[in-house]
């Protein structure tokens, strides 16, 4: 991570940390870095989610892009993976998504995709940061015909919808589905896609007002969807987050099916079809012990990375794997798209149900999840977050708790990549054990570096 770029672009409270001035600089300098080797006039796609600050930041970012001679195509409200898909398909120079994903409405973020549809490499981000921090802006300032132009690209969403539908390889007629679009980016696509695939739909979280994105809806709050699934007697529920790069499901009984279980279900099906590259699934350190045991039982190899879908994708690209993801619901199908895609993941999950004839609860029952607890501790600042593991008292309590578990469980303490939070997670055979371990560590963290 750099000074401005975290694990998922530049994030902060909109108009306080992530200001219009910063958005302009990111557009100007980011656009320059990503297009300086173009032989023709560079073309950049810009999308956003439904946050009230999105239009403000988009106008500033676009101004920066135009100032260095870039042709900008405004996609409007669209899912993050839609930007990545269209950039690669249309041969654009780069793409930019304005979103803070699952974060609340007061936050926003800006992330870049290269012309290949993948998130930027660290080297490119550092190059952009160096230009932002330079004492003087020495980039070209073209005038008249050298300036870029802004184009509305409303058909981009329709192209993305058409792509999603092709991945179903059939339809979902007869399935009753609850969709939760989190009052976010997928409200422009999810209903249309699944209706065209002939599913019977009930949709919640489909009325964004700029402030209600992720509020008691979406993949981080699936309770409302679970209730609706039971009320309507639906076969399953599918919840996306604010920018629709995640999926969390709910079975016909209202039980949550997280990213680990979805990855197992789809991974096992791909293995049986001979379509799981090298019989391997890529996941992160956050995935549950029970998930790994189920993979082993099914004959699936696993490769573990640091937390963050960018690290999963890097591993997949490096070793030619085609499927991976995170417990949080990011799932990457490199045979279809370059980044996590909630709607694509939902289609693949429904496809497994259709092809096997099994209910979601039957498919998910093959994974026995160990009790897990995760607590986010708000710390003083980002410096405290990064140095937390150097604090003797924190080191000591983690060591003591690991000893107390006798090898039957695990502890993971790590800084958030996007917020001043320290994440404390543990897994153990019983809920009592996991509560004791996490609560004990959290108490020490709060005492040492927490916000008083």
UniProtKB/Swiss-Prot annotation:
Its EC number is 5.4.2.10. Belongs to the phosphohexose mutase family. GO terms for cellular component: cytosol. Gene3D superfamilies: Alpha-D-Glucose-1,6-Bisphosphate, subunit A, domain 3 (3.40.120.10), Alpha-D-phosphohexomutase, C-terminal domain (3.30.310.50). Mg(2+) binds at residues 101, 241, 243, 245. The keyword Isomerase applies. InterPro entries: A-D-PHexomutase_a/b/a-I, A-D-PHexomutase_a/b/a-I/II/III, A-D-PHexomutase_a/b/a-II, A-D-PHexomutase_a/b/a-III, A-D-PHexomutase_C, A-D-PHexomutase_C_sf, A-D-PHexomutase_CS, Alpha-D-phosphohexomutase_SF. Binds 1 Mg(2+) ion per subunit. The modification Phosphoserine is found at residue 101. It comes from Lactococcus lactis subsp. cremoris (strain MG1363). Activated by phosphorylation. It is an enzyme of class 5 (isomerase). GO terms for molecular function: magnesium ion binding; phosphoglucosamine mutase activity; phosphomannomutase activity. It comes from the Bacteria. This is Phosphoglucosamine mutase. GO terms for biological process: carbohydrate metabolic process; peptidoglycan biosynthetic process; UDP-N-acetylglucosamine biosynthetic process. Keywords: Isomerase, Magnesium, Metal-binding, Phosphoprotein. Catalyzes the conversion of glucosamine-6-phosphate to glucosamine-1-phosphate. SUPFAM superfamilies: Phosphoglucomutase, C-terminal domain, Phosphoglucomutase, first 3 domains. It catalyses: alpha-D-glucosamine 1-phosphate = D-glucosamine 6-phosphate. The gene is glmM. The active site is at residue 101. Its cofactor is Mg(2+).
